[in-house]
């Protein structure tokens, strides 16, 4: 993240997504992965605030970003003070530069440890690097400050946090992109994946690694958010596939008098899946209320 990006069209989608979690009672911790402004024109796309055609999606957020964009020398502290992410914590220290490769590595390690201390009471940590995930996992590389390292993602997840980090497709072809999205899910195979991609302006993706115990709750938040923002966000799948359909408990099987077997299963997203052996290629998916209404006819 750079201060020059603040309030651009990408920020609207980003803060709306994080706000969905914060307003649902999830304690969000933001590590900006802050880097120096570079003098480029990136982050200048704020005219959407003047047009106003996207305001209806999240009016309170839209209006707050409009206030901030009119300030001179706006910084991430303006976001932190605005309250757009209720109850959120922040780590705003810039990623250290300078020195030999070994010195940069040591500085990076200390910086990251400080971030965990600052965000210790978070449930979901959002990491906002400039360019996404550095697959090589090498903090000594040139421009590594623009990336989150796989070791850092794993450290957060193993520390009990759910994690979401920013990345973008760039020039990757489809196969390379799916492999890239799958990197952390292959490394942390007990994490439940979700990937939401924002299509307004430059494509931006948000990769979630969710603990099993929180997956149903987080899926509910994501689904509710996406039902409103579906024109601008799409869900992408990694090589693992769509884990929302995974069965989480032993199925309940009913044998009918005509010989058919009806199987009732609970899915990872909390919905109920019903299959009939006489029609094995199709199944019915219901939420809990729909299931109860069908059973009790109320």
Residue ranges and their predicted role:
Residues 1-254:
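Class I S-adenosyl-L-methionine-dependent methyltransferase catalytic core
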Residues 32-36, 268, 278, 290:
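Short glycine-rich, polar/acidic loop-and-turn segments at beta strand-coil junctions
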Residues 102, 175, 219, 264, ...:
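Generic alpha-helix signal with a bias toward terminal, lower-confidence helices
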Residues 193, 239, 245, 262-264, ...:
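Generic structural motif
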Residues 245-249, 279-298:
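Mixed-charge, Lys/Arg-enriched low-complexity segments
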Residues 253, 263-265, 291:
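Compositionally biased non-globular segments, especially hydrophobic aliphatic-rich helices
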Residues 259-286:
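Acidic, low-complexity, intrinsically disordered interaction modules
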